[in-house]
């Protein structure tokens, strides 16, 4: 029986999850919820089901795999990754996985705060000033490795790809000074299953965020 991934009909927190499900050739189907337009942003499609699914902490995204019912995007990623040994093998690799998992979430939240703010234009200018330093840290962490944890791909590469691609949409030149990050993005998009998925109608590069956002909501 296929797994069910539930989320809004946007990219958001499900992007890395969808990519990982495709890369691992997992059998899954999606339940995509639609949010209404302004000013009400009606969420009844989701709210009508929210407390009926047997989730411990009802939220989006969720993954249901038989008796396993999981919320929190990184918990979902780790669940899928454990099935395919994509969590790092040595202690050093696992440390790098843990660091990047949390760093990616921090950066994702920072960008989302800017994009959801009514003061978007002012916050964008401040964010762009910090962006080169932020990307430099990712570049240093990757170094000359093929993937962020070493020569074998792990689930945090899916998070890193999501973060880098988000920022390329936000500021298309943001990786110009970091050839290793540009190469990483190209290498990731060149993975056979990812490349095939990106050509399907199921693939959502945008909208980045829900309709409540000031930027990235289309």
From Swiss-Prot:
EC number: 2.5.1.18, 4.4.1.20
UniProt keyword terms in alphabetical order: Cytoplasm, Lipid metabolism, Lyase, Transferase
Major site of localization recorded for this protein: cytoplasm
Locations listed in the record: Cytoplasm
Record carries keyword tRNA processing: no
Ranges of residues in domain GST N-terminal: 1-88
SUPFAM superfamilies in the record: GST C-terminal domain-like, Thioredoxin-like
PROSITE patterns in UniProt: GST_CTER (PS50405), GST_NTER (PS50404)
GO biological process, one term: nitrobenzene metabolic process
GO molecular function: enzyme binding; glutathione binding; glutathione transferase activity; leukotriene-C4 synthase activity; protein homodimerization activity
Binding site for substrate: 116
Domain of life the protein comes from: Eukaryota
Ranges where the GST C-terminal domain occurs: 90-208
Role this protein plays: Conjugation of reduced glutathione to a wide number of exogenous and endogenous hydrophobic electrophiles. Catalyzes the conjugation of leukotriene A4 with reduced glutathione (GSH) to form leukotriene C4. Can also catalyze the transfer of a glutathionyl group from glutathione (GSH) to 13(S),14(S)-epoxy-docosahexaenoic acid to form maresin conjugate in tissue regeneration 1 (MCTR1), a bioactive lipid mediator that possess potent anti-inflammatory and proresolving actions.
The protein, known as: Glutathione S-transferase Mu 4
Organism: Rattus norvegicus
Taxonomic classification: Eukaryota, Metazoa, Chordata, Craniata, Vertebrata
